[in-house]
Amino acid sequence: MQAAYERIEADMRGIWGDMAPAMLRKRLRDVHADLSTLSREDLQRIVELLRQKTLPSILGEDGAEVKAKQYLAWVDDSG
């Protein structure tokens, strides 16, 4: 799951720049997860929060939905 998390972070850096890691750490706390023990379910919940609360501010609702689907595909691909 670490690889998927890092891929999401890299993509988010393209949108929010240096704020991306802090935004993801906030979502980690929101789901009571730790990066060192991140599970698929944790990462799926993080992506859902990103879709609902973070991504729409820049991408709009439709863009947030598309980006969240991309992120979930990365989660699925990572094992």
Task: Give residue spans per PLM region.
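N-terminal acidic leader/helix
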Residues: 1-30
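Residue-level marker of intrinsically disordered, low-complexity segments enriched
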Residues: 6, 13, 44-45, 73
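Acidic, low-complexity cytosolic segments
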Residues: 16, 24, 59-60, 72
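Long, compositionally biased, intrinsically disordered segments
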Residues: 28, 61-64, 77-79
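Alpha-helix boundary/interfacial micro-motifs
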Residues: 34-35, 79
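Short, charged early-sequence alpha-helical segments and their helix-coil boundaries
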Residues: 35-71
